[in-house]
Every structure is written in C-alpha cells, then in structure tokens.
C-alpha cells in the first residue's frame, strides 16, 4: 500500500470497508495478456505518480478513474505503458484516440498465435519478424506492445502528419523503440498499401484498427451512447472530444466495411509482400461483405479470430494469398 504524503487520501479511500467484490481477472482476455487482472492502482501510482490526482472512490467503495475524462484515460494509459512495457515517455495531442490497452494487447497476442500456427506452434520472435501497422496514430500502441512482448520490428503508417509527429516524439524518447519502429506518412488518403510497400519489401503480418463509422454524425452518436452508459450524458455536447479521436481515426466514407473492402482489394496487388494481412472488425454485420471481398480477391486462406473482453466481443479477420508451398518457403527463409 502506498504510504508517502501525496497519496494519504488515496490510501484511506483504498481501504474502505464494504467494498464490492470484483472478479480478480477480466474474463475473455488472452492468457498472455498482462492486463487480465483488475487495474492495480497502488502499483500503477508508484510507477506513474501523475495518475494519483485522477483517482477517486466509486459508488462501490473501490478506487478508479473517470473513464469519460480524456485526461484521466490518457494518464491511465501512460501508467500502464510505463508499468508493463517500460515506456518512459508517452503522450498524445488533445483529441487524438486514446485506445484501451488491454484490447489492443489481445490483438497482438492473437496475431502472435496466428503466426505460430504456421510455424509448428512456435511464435516467431525478434527483429526478423516485420509487422506493418496501418494507422499507427499518435499513440504507437501496437508497436509498443509487439516490440516488448515479441521483439518484433514495426513500420507504422498514417495519413495525419500531426499524429506522426507525436509518434516520432514517443520513438525518440524511448530507446527500445528507436531501432524497431519506422514511421511513414501515407500521402494518398485513398490508398492503404500503395506508396508504402516497396516492390521487394516483405512483412510477416499487417494489423489495422480501421475507422469504423461512415460519418462524423454516426461517430458522435456512438460516443453519446457510451457516455450515457457511463452516466455522463451531461458532457455529451462535445462527444468526440470526451473519448478522443480525430476524424480520420473515427470515420471514413463507407465506414468500416468500405475501408476494409478497399484494403482487401489493394492487398491482392501486394500478394507476395505479406504473409498475413489482418484487420480488426468491430461490427459482426460487416463480416459478410468482407468475406465477399476476399472471395473476389482470390484469397487462398481466410481466418476469423474471435476475441472477448468481458461482455464485449470483437474479432479480426486474417487472409493470405500464399499457397501452402509458398507458406512453407516463407517460414524456412524468415522464421
């Protein structure tokens, strides 16, 4: 338990009696996910004392943060990244997406399992494994986790120069990222791989958290629903700002279905550049359209990997254009 002066109030709060008993582990998360246990605010506050002012008692006599507050969520992420991944500096500009780290970690771990399934059950690790993060954003979450857990090398792309500027600062301030994360701007907002992948460039996997709304209004309506569930309807006048996310992060023409369908079509022109192309799919109703696009693109193999965080279910779709013989040759050469 914390004992030094600034946390005295927090210490008293965290020892309140009649606290609600919560499960010790979050259900559904990947077995290797470092965030399976409930947030240990004692430990997080030691790693990142800046978190302490954002801690407050809940109605159940527990300690937490206000998850409707972008500053509180950002500070929680900063503490998690420092405590679990050794990231000394991490910051994002106002209004940029501040992603939930446990869910992002699940994607990385399931992606590792996907690679292992093609490598005799052994997860390929180290700098020989190259991963392309489409839409790395200002937060660099996937490269941070992938580098720390598996030693992978990343290229992160984004169309927003402000996001890349913030990401470059994170890289420059953390030695573990300097030689393992390369950042590239996608200058054509209609392209995904074109202009990024060189002819002879090879990636073992791609990952992407696509913009899933079809308009700014749809994104705002979703955020209002989230705020209402948190009992924060009074702050819904500025919905996007409360949860974070620039327009390019939250929505695009055609929404999730349109974006991933374009990704599938473009990936077919880069069939030999990557072993597994993958993308998160937030809406289950999007899947039939994506499967149709993959059939049209003549993908050799398609997998859907389900993930869960409590009652929330998500998934990512993975596809490859490599034949079994080409997959075996890739494994022998790179892993």
From Swiss-Prot:
Q: Which GO terms describe its cellular component?
A: cytoplasm
A GO molecular-function annotation: 23S rRNA (adenine(1618)-N(6))-methyltransferase activity
User: Would you say which domain of life the source belongs to?
Assistant: Bacteria
- Reaction equation(s) it catalyzes: adenosine(1618) in 23S rRNA + S-adenosyl-L-methionine = N(6)-methyladenosine(1618) in 23S rRNA + S-adenosyl-L-homocysteine + H(+)
Q: Which GO terms describe its biological process?
A: rRNA base methylation
Q: What is its EC number?
A: 2.1.1.181
Which keywords appear in this protein's UniProt record, sorted alphabetically? Answer: Cytoplasm, Methyltransferase, rRNA processing, S-adenosyl-L-methionine, Transferase
Where in the cell does this protein reside? Answer: Cytoplasm
What is the main EC category here?
Answer: transferase
What Pfam family is a match, any one?
A: Methyltransf_10
By sequence similarity, the record places it as follows: Belongs to the methyltransferase superfamily. METTL16/RlmF family.
The function of this protein is: Specifically methylates the adenine in position 1618 of 23S rRNA.
| Name this polypeptide is given | Ribosomal RNA large subunit methyltransferase F
At the highest ranks, the source species' classification is: Bacteria, Pseudomonadati, Pseudomonadota, Gammaproteobacteria, Enterobacterales
Gene assigned in the entry: rlmF
């Amino acid at each position: 338990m914390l004992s030094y002066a600034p946390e005295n109030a927090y210490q008293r709060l965290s020892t309140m009696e009649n606290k609600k008993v919560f499960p010790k582990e979050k259900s559904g998360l990947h077995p290797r996910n470092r965030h399976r246990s409930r947030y240990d605010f004692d430990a997080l506050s030691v790693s990142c004392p800046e978190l302490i002012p954002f801690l407050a008692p809940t109605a159940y006599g527990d300690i937490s943060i206000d998850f409707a507050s972008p500053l509180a969520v950002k500070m929680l992420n900063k503490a998690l990244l420092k405590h679990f991944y050794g990231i000394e500096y991490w910051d994002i500009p106002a209004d940029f997406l501040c992603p939930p780290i446990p869910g992002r970690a699940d994607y990385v771990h399931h992606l590792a399992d996907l690679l292992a399934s093609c490598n005799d059950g052994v997860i390929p690790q180290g700098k020989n494994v190259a991963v392309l993060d489409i839409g790395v954003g200002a937060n660099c979450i996937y490269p941070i986790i992938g580098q720390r857990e598996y030693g992978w090398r990343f290229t992160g792309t984004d169309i927003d120069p402000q996001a890349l500027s913030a990401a470059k600062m994170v890289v420059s301030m953390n030695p573990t990222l300097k030689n393992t994360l390369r950042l590239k701007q996608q200058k054509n907002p209609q392209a995904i791989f074109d202009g990024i992948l060189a002819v002879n460039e090879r990636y073992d996997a791609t990952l992407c958290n696509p913009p899933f709304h079809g308009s700014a209004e749809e994104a705002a309506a979703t955020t209002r629903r989230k705020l209402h569930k948190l009992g924060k309807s009074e702050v819904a006048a500025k919905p996007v700002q409360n949860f974070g996310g620039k327009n390019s992060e939250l929505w695009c023409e055609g929404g999730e279905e349109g974006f991933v369908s374009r990704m599938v079509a473009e990936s077919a022109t880069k069939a030999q550049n990557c072993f597994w192309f993958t993308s998160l799919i937030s809406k289950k109703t999007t899947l039939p359209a994506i499967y149709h696009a993959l059939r049209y693109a003549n993908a050799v193999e398609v997998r859907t990997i389900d993930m869960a965080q409590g009652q929330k279910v998500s998934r990512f779709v993975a596809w490859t254009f490599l034949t079994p013989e080409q997959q075996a040759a890739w494994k022998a050469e790179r892993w």
